[in-house]
């Protein structure tokens, strides 16, 4: 049976990652500006706030390469909340060097300052009942993660694959000895997670109370250098010497002649099935507690996934293998009931992927920017071709902003776009793009904040397959009443505004 996700009501939302919120401490956090953004969303007639993965960032500061599929990102913790709790003094936070430019995140500086301040707060912290309840409730992932991070710290943050053999292979007596010797470091990571989830839960409760639902994001693969792979190597394509045998990526295409080599280990789906898909059930269940709805990245891999030999230097010589398909989602529905999932089904997908999507009943994604390619009016990404059960975007975190794209697109595509959105001199072009997506049959329309603000390519969040300079864009100041009025007007005009009764009912 298909889930009640099919009842996605006509509505709209905004894509803005937490790190992009304005703040004086170099990075957006779960503090006051996040609560103010919820107020802005409400005033703007919106129903959803979509964020990128909120897990700790690892390689190249990407939220899609995390040392944990379950932990929260310490960089998102609001330091001023720690002042209110008496764990820090205002002077501890003020006058530090968090980075010069208020419109970007300087990760190196932010990480150095936050690490020091969180340590300082930890030394003042006294364990209480709610802390003890948290570490008990979350022990199923938290203990492994805290231990993993503590060992990593004592190995100069090097990958676990370079650790001493006994630690790599998780010899119980060696782990027990390490725990005993470094218990304070382990407790520090528990404390940081407690603070993160306390703040996250407070923000989510405030959003829900104000009729705003949060859409999260699950990266499809775990990072090789993660607690998840270190603890569960048998669930991945990892051999007995703990080396990957097959890794993830996508084959060559028009944009990328040698394909994309992501390097994450793949899932051993046979082992996962024997285990009752327990790891994925835990992951989706955890996400459903964190968010109201969740986007699963690279959804096509559940049908067919591309497997590349681990020693390959490009993605040219991989092969397609069969994923778990409906077996996984039937198990999810049986164990967790109906779950609100958005399937990221972008790119060149097989008919079997379309069938899986249809069998699950999950909405897929459409991106207007992709509509102005060589397919002309038949492109599924042009608004008139949208189905009702989909989530439509002007662009995602992997696209240029609308204004950036208009400048860099080839003349033919830009001309087609301007004609399609009926760009005229009465409103800014970014607004015409938003209007087109809002007017479409898509049940849910999500607009990146950069496109609402009409920011050029400097607001781009990520350029796929590049390292460095990504994930850094920030709003210099909070969104204003003028932009809220504009979005409210569009949400009202295109029947996407939540009715007062619907909001009351959702509570």
Predicted regions and their residues:
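Conserved, well-ordered alpha-helix/loop/beta-strand core segments that scaffold catalytic motifs
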Residues: 189, 193-222
């Amino acid at each position: 049976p298909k889930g009640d996700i099919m009842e996605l009501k006509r509505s709209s939302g905004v894509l803005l990652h937490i790190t992009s919120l304005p703040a004086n401490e170099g990075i957006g956090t779960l503090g006051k500006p996040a609560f103010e953004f919820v107020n802005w969303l409400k005033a703007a007639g919106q129903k959803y706030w979509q964020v990128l993965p909120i897990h700790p960032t690892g390689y190249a500061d990407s939220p899609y390469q995390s040392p944990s599929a379950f932990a929260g990102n310490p960089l998102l913790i609001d330091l001023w909340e720690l002042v209110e709790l008496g764990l820090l003094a205002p002077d501890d936070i003020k006058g530090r060097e968090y980075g010069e430019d208020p419109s970007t995140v300087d990760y190196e500086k932010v990480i150095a300052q936050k690490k020091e301040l969180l340590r300082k707060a930890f030394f003042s912290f006294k364990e209480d009942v709610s802390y003890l309840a948290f570490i008990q409730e979350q022990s199923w992932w938290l203990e492994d993660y805290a231990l993993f991070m503590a060992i990593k710290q004592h190995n100069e943050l090097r990958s676990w694959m370079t650790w001493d053999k006994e630690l790599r292979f998780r010899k119980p007596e060696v782990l027990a000895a390490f725990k005993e010797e470094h218990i304070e470091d382990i407790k520090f990571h528990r404390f940081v997670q407690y603070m993160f989830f306390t703040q996250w839960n407070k923000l989510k409760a405030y959003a829900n109370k104000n009729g705003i639902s949060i859409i999260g994001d699950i990266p499809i693969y775990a990072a090789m250098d993660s607690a998840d792979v270190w603890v569960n190597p048998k669930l991945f394509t990892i051999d007995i010497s703990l080396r990957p045998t097959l890794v993830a990526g996508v084959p060559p295409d028009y944009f990328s002649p040698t394909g994309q080599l992501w390097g994450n280990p793949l899932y051993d789906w046979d082992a996962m099935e024997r285990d009752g898909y327990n790891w994925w059930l835990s992951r989706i269940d955890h996400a459903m507690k964190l968010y109201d709805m969740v986007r699963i990245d690279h959804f096509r891999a559940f049908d067919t996934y591309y497997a590349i030999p681990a020693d390959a230097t490009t993605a040219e010589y991989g092969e397609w293998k069969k994923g778990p398909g409906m077996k996984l989602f039937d198990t999810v529905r049986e164990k967790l009931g109906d779950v609100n999932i958005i399937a990221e089904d972008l790119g060149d997908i097989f008919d079997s992927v379309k069938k899986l999507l249809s069998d699950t009943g999950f909405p897929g994604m459409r991106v207007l920017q992709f509509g102005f390619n060589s397919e002309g009016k038949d492109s599924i990404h042009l608004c008139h071709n949208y189905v009702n059960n989909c989530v439509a975007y002007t662009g995602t975190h992997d696209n240029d902003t609308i204004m950036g794209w208009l400048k860099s697109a080839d003349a033919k595509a830009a001309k087609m776009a301007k004609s399609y959105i009926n760009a005229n001199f009465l409103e800014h072009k970014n607004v015409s793009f938003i209007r087109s997506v809002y007017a479409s049959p898509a049940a849910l329309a999500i607009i990146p904040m950069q496109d609402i603000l009409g920011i050029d390519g400097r607001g781009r969040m990520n350029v796929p397959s590049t390292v460095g300079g990504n994930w850094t864009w920030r709003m210099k100041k909070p969104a204003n009443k003028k932009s809220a009025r504009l979005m409210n007007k569009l949400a009202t005009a295109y029947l996407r505004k939540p009715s007062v009764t619907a909001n009351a009912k959702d509570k």
